[in-house]
């Protein structure tokens, strides 16, 4: 019997293990020098002004929206076709998530759809760089600038992504994820990246109890005695155990993303005649991070629905993922917004399937997945 091929597996090697061991032996395992190293390395690699490590991208989104003063009576524009944490945070802050539809084939919002959704109550716009591809930032920034509304880029899928001549995270405000399946992982973690000095200071304050100065003194490895709480804050800091893994992973990003690109190219070659629909890549110049490789399983074309297709792959010892079920189709939001209709999000939500993709996969693994897909579809077409 074949071994189980998971949808994703972190590419953890001896360097990451040694980095964790070094932190454990250092006597300082919470937020400290490895956090500083991670933030510094990210800024140097991508030309960012500020990078603030947090315990998750969700935590990062929370403190960014808090720092921007988002609250009751405000509206925040976001796609529904995203991980539900963004919509949850907006809702928990007492604001209204204004969910807009996406392009059918890139899964990203357009500047036109965002512009139509702007009202006098709009206080932020959160586009998602999807699956490793960048949004059309020029168009989105033009809309946001014209309206005087902050743009917060959800870059959880986009570490190592370029839009035209800039890295994602080089300009503006972006939030990155180091979750277990991401291109750079430390199990759980994230970064808030911004070129706004005031926003960076507030995020640093809010993510660690509201302390008004850097709480870690690198000379004595402890909390500065003069640190004072200047506003209520949260406990969203990242431990050095996690940060040490991310530092090594970040140094390996080019190598790992190159392997992802190789695997995706092979998938695309072998599936080009399949009734499965692959995502389109943006027409504007970009560098794709290939975070996910997704297909759409349309029953009309494939003779099988997505859920059955995923189950049959599981029976063949192949894992898959769903990224994502549109937020407005989830029970809570379905009941809260019963008349909301977003046709492209709904169709993709019902047909999307993420195939196995991670740096330690081999070309033989891709061929195995493709052969299994062909066997399944041949039974239904």
UniProtKB/Swiss-Prot annotation:
Belongs to the DegT/DnrJ/EryC1 family. ArnB subfamily. This is UDP-4-amino-4-deoxy-L-arabinose--oxoglutarate aminotransferase. CDD domains: AHBA_syn. GO terms for molecular function: pyridoxal phosphate binding; UDP-4-amino-4-deoxy-L-arabinose aminotransferase. The gene is arnB. Homodimer. GO terms for biological process: lipid A biosynthetic process; lipopolysaccharide biosynthetic process; response to antibiotic. PANTHER family: TRANSAMINASE, UDP-4-AMINO-4-DEOXY-L-ARABINOSE--OXOGLUTARATE AMINOTRANSFERASE. Its cofactor is pyridoxal 5'-phosphate. Catalyzes the conversion of UDP-4-keto-arabinose (UDP-Ara4O) to UDP-4-amino-4-deoxy-L-arabinose (UDP-L-Ara4N). The modified arabinose is attached to lipid A and is required for resistance to polymyxin and cationic antimicrobial peptides. The keyword Lipid biosynthesis applies.
């Amino acid at each position: 019997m074949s071994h189980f091929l998971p949808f994703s597996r972190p590419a953890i090697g001896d360097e990451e293990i040694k980095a964790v061991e070094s932190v454990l032996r250092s006597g300082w395992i919470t937020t400290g020098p490895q956090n500083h190293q991670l933030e510094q390395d990210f800024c140097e690699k991508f030309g960012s002004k500020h990078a603030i490590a947090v315990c998750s991208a969700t935590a990062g989104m929370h403190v960014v929206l808090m720092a921007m003063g988002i609250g009751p009576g405000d509206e925040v524009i976001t796609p529904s076709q995203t991980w539900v944490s963004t919509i949850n945070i907006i809702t928990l802050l007492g604001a209204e998530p204004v969910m807009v539809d996406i392009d059918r084939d890139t899964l990203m919002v357009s500047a036109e759809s965002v512009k139509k959704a702007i009202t006098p109550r709009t206080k932020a716009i959160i586009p998602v760089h999807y699956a490793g591809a960048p949004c059309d930032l020029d168009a989105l920034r033009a809309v946001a600038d014209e309206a005087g509304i902050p743009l917060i880029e959800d870059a959880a899928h986009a570490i190592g992504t370029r839009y035209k001549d800039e890295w994602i995270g080089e300009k503006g405000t972006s939030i990155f994820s180091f979750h277990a399946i991401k291109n750079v992982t430390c199990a759980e973690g994230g970064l808030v990246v911004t070129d706004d000095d005031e926003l960076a200071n507030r995020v640093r304050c809010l993510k660690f109890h509201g302390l008004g100065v850097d709480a870690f003194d690198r000379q004595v490895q402890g909390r500065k005695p003069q640190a004072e709480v200047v506003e209520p804050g949260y406990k969203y800091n990242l431990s050095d155990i996690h940060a040490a893994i991310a530092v090594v992973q970040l140094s390996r990003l080019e190598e790992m993303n190159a392997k992802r690109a190789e695997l995706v190219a092979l998938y695309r070659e072998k599936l080009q005649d399949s009734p499965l629909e692959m995502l389109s890549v943006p027409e504007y110049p970009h560098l794709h991070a290939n975070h996910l490789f997704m297909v759409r399983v349309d029953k009309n074309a494939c003779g099988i629905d997505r859920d059955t297709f995923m189950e049959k792959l599981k029976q063949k010892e192949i894992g898959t993922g769903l990224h994502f079920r549109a937020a407005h189709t989830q029970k809570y939001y379905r009941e809260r917004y019963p008349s909301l209709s977003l046709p492209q999000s709904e169709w993709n939500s019902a047909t999307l399937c993420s195939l196995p993709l991670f740096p330690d996969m081999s070309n033989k693994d891709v061929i195995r997945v493709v052969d299994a897909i062909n066997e399944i579809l041949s039974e239904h077409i």
